[in-house]
């Protein structure tokens, strides 16, 4: 799940649940501007700075910052599809430090690279250092960045391991009996929803937490319990 998903976090589609970043044993990340603290890193050029989601769990707006804008610019955490600095995809919105590049403003084709996620971690301790996300196009309605849609490369730079994932947009498939139809990540301050497939006709994907077939506890930029659901 971009699922940023934010990220970001718990997020990766699947891993972007890969909007929330990779599971880590610490909440600390290194600030790329050099101030050691628990601040998120500074943004790279053209990376999105936050992931917003109107979650169907309670209809609240959840915000997952991914990086800090530079040059006195702030990253808006308000839902606004018309501010020039946002890409909206259904119930989620990506925020940018500056106006969205024109090269992004088109619907993704089936073969097009839609999203790039770059994870930095300490190569020895595996502690998460940073996440940078880059959109290349707009994922159309009824589509997402499924976990099995990405290619991954790993490189080492000094004491850091760099994991780069390239995602494609795919239309939601019909769930099979043993598929996760959606997952709910419930944190101390945020609730994140990630849809994985459409239930067959006559079935629904539950939101009641006691219906989960699997639960998993993770610590990233927050403490989350993830509830995975199957169609009923």
From Swiss-Prot:
Tissues in which the UniProt entry reports expression: Expressed by the venom gland.
Modified how: Contains 8 disulfide bonds.
Q: Which UniProt keywords apply?
A: Disulfide bond, Secreted, Signal, Toxin
Question: Annotated Gene Ontology MF terms?
Answer: toxin activity
Q: Name one GO cellular component term.
A: extracellular region
List the subcellular locations: Secreted
What are the boundaries of the signal sequence? 1-21
Domain of life per record: Eukaryota
Chief place where the protein resides: secreted
Similarity field: Belongs to the scoloptoxin-11 family.
Please report the name of this protein according to its UniProt entry. U-scoloptoxin(11)-Sa3a
Query: What is the organism field in this record?
Result: Scolopendra alternans (Florida Keys giant centipede)
